[in-house]
């Protein structure tokens, strides 16, 4: 399990995005996904990022195969939840309501987006009443 959401830099997040999409990947595959045809320095950069992510608990390494295969140790939804809660804690005293209000106001939500949000609120209301 990851220590804290703030441990993930934007560059590390780009590596996690590849792993979320691929499920598992080698250093070479991640480097190719991020940089196209890779030079040794890019390969080394990806290895360093994976080492940092592993130390932080965000990725796992399978050493039983060669080359080693990496997989995400945190799901995208979990990281999103943690980051949003951290933002709510930092700016809104832990309340999600002001954060969500700010996110939704002034956005050009489609009719479908608004309907999905209404359905989610209805679902949450039903869960809360049972």
Language-model features, listed with the residues they occupy:
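Short alpha-helical segments that sit at the start of domains
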Residues: 1-18, 78-79
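Short beta-strand "wing" residues that participate in macromolecule-binding interfaces
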Residues: 61
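Short, hydrophobic-biased segments on the C-terminal half of alpha helices
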Residues: 47-51
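Glycine-centered, phosphate/nucleic-acid-interacting loop/turn motifs that mediate DNA/RNA or nucleotide
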Residues: 57
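Short acidic, hydrophobic short linear motifs in intrinsically disordered regions
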Residues: 25-34
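Short, cationic-aromatic polyanion-contact patches
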Residues: 9, 64-83
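Amphipathic alpha-helical dimerization/coiled-coil segments
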Residues: 79-127
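Short capping segments at the starts of secondary-structure elements
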Residues: 18-26
């Amino acid at each position: 399990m990851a220590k804290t959401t703030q441990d993930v830099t934007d560059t590390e997040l780009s590596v996690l995005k590849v792993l979320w999409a691929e499920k598992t990947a080698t250093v070479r595959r991640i480097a190719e996904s991020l940089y196209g045809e890779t030079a040794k320095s890019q390969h080394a950069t990806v290895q360093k990022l994976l080492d940092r992510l592993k130390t932080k608990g965000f990725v796992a390494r399978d050493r039983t195969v060669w080359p080693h295969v990496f997989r995400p140790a945190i799901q995208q939804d979990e990281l999103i939840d943690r980051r949003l809660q951290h933002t709510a804690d930092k700016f809104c005293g832990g309340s999600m309501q002001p954060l969500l209000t700010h996110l939704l106001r002034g956005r050009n939500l489609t009719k479908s987006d608004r309907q999905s949000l209404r359905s989610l609120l209805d679902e949450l209301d039903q869960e809360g009443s049972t």
